[in-house]
């Protein structure tokens, strides 16, 4: 195990109990809940994990909750996001009260319909990584549940019945299939695309921050990643803290998707996903 990764995981485990106590004592969103002028729902997809600990620490420091969508992606440390070595990180986030959904296990992109009851996909990772595959509903549902089962094995907690398609690419078919096996799709607001995957030469962090602060509204869902391979000037170290403080100054609170009006009825009617499902 590389020293940097070992230190990251040790920090995650060491701060979990302290973070849980702090979050439990805080009002939702880190400010007086009664004073909220609106709620923004921060969400993070996996990725290179280069900013994973910074993001966790920032959320903990501000005593706010977010929602994470998990796929088994390659990381900067040479392992994958759902390997055993990352269990302390995910356990610490779960202990803090964050919510979790599936991002498919092998980060599987929708590529188009392939005839009656069939859809073409391209996994980014795994045995079929980089190749097109054609799946029916049972195979697609199994792919969604793989992340849920792995999350339960690592944390002891069930995964929320939510999913996000890689790249946001889906069809009426895949959305219906996912609902049949217990997952509602979560997209993001136009203003909620925080731009961390865009080239920093054309989209500098300051411009992305100002755009988000001026555009986000009550109920908006944001989307960023726990690390992006291609961006030279990472987004999170420059923008996450000022985004949170800037929104707090405008009277916004933060919550997980468990509290989003669009998903509350679904979550109330559908059980969380465990390895036993």
For each feature predicted by the language model, list its residue ranges:
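Bacterial N-terminal signal peptides that target proteins for export
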Residues: 1-15
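C-terminal domain-boundary segment and adjacent tail
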Residues: 29-34, 66, 76, 232-277
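Acidic-and-aromatic substrate-binding clefts and catalytic sites of carbohydrate-active enzymes
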Residues: 46-51, 72-85, 108-113, 162-172, ...
């Amino acid at each position: 195990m590389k020293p940097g990764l070992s230190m990251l995981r040790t920090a995650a485990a060491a701060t979990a109990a302290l973070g849980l106590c702090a979050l439990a004592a805080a009002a939702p969103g880190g400010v007086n809940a009664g004073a909220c002028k609106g709620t923004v729902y921060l969400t993070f997809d996996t990725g290179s994990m280069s900013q994973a600990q910074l993001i966790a620490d920032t959320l903990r420091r501000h005593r706010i909750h977010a929602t994470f969508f998990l796929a088994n992606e390659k990381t900067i440390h040479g392992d994958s996001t759902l390997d055993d070595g990352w269990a302390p990180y995910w356990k610490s986030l779960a202990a803090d009260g964050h919510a979790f959904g599936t991002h498919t296990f092998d980060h599987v992109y929708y590529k188009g319909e392939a005839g009656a009851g069939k859809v073409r996909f391209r996994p980014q990772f795994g045995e079929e990584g980089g190749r097109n595959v054609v799946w029916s509903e049972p195979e697609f549902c199994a792919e969604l549940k793989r992340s849920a089962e792995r999350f339960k094995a690592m944390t002891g907690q069930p995964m929320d019945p939510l999913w996000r398609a890689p790249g946001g690419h889906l069809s009426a078919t895949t959305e219906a299939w996912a609902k049949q096996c217990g997952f509602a799709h979560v997209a993001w607001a136009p203003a909620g695309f925080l731009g961390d995957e865009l080239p920093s030469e054309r989209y500098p962090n300051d411009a992305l921050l100002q755009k988000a602060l001026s555009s986000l509204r009550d109920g908006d869902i944001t989307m960023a990643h726990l690390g992006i391979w291609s961006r030279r000037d990472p987004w999170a170290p420059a923008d996450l803290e000022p985004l949170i403080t800037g929104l707090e100054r405008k009277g916004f609170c933060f919550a997980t998707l468990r509290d989003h009006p669009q998903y509350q009825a679904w979550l109330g009617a559908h059980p969380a996903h465990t390895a036993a499902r």
